[in-house]
Amino acid sequence: FHQFWICKFAPFKEYKNFYKWANDYVDITQKYLGYAQVKDYSNARKKDFWHHIRYHIITFTQAEAGFSTDVKEIILEVDMKPITNKIIDKLHRDLVVKSSDGKLILADTGVKLQAKHLQLASGTVKFEDGSSRIIDDSKAVFVKEKFKRKKLGIFYKFKEELEMLKQTFGNELTTDLQEFDNSDKNIALQFISGREGLSLRNADFLVAINIDFSAVTYFQFRDRMTTMDRKENTLYWIFSKSGIEHKVYKAVQSKKSYTNDLFQKDFRIKATSKDNSQTYSRRLALR
């Protein structure tokens, strides 16, 4: 909206700000962030405004630019340690887990439960006091053993996953693109920071040890190895067996972000709103 709003010749100039525009073109809903209730403006009705702006937008696809890369995606499953699944089950059941040293994993809202579940499924956890811990390095060990003597671009989602990769790969890992291009080291990049503007053309494969809820991130991740002279790219997704990652992947591959509504449906969680907080009645659908 802002890019059009700053131009006096563009449509929508009669709206004083985004919020006035959103009242006419967005299905505004409520969502919970921690204990706060905020308005969600993400569901814009494209069918109502696209005819106003399509004449002002120029599209140029990779195919039109001469790119003809075939992207092959392979899912590999990893058996996580029993403790990992036990913590996930208990968190769904009780919404809180206490470690042996008194640290709390708290999932008192649907958004937090969704995020904690995904993080735990890849072997790390962030406690309520802000500290993090590696509880299961199965995915990192699997990647190191599976892809020996290969040059990898490894993507992770949560910060503690980088520490897990560093502990597993040691000196075989870098986070610097220049060092990656000029050595035999693998590179580790976070989805959000590594999804845009970086070319990993020197990687043999891209490997993701987790997955982001965003469909935009999914498609930008797929393009990190694309060049005009590279005809085939192979991407590996490392998922826990029967884990939440499979459900997220199904959504983002269909160009849909994995929302909390989808999470609640997949895991049979019924959320109710009362006094700006959420309580949950649960029946697990963990396979």
What are these regions (language model features)?
Residues 159-166:
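Catalytic donor nucleotide-activated moiety binding site of glycosyltransferases and closely related
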Residues 12-150, 252:
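Inter-lobe coupling linker of SF2 helicases/translocases
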Residues 162, 173-255:
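Conserved RecA-like P-loop NTPase helicase motor core
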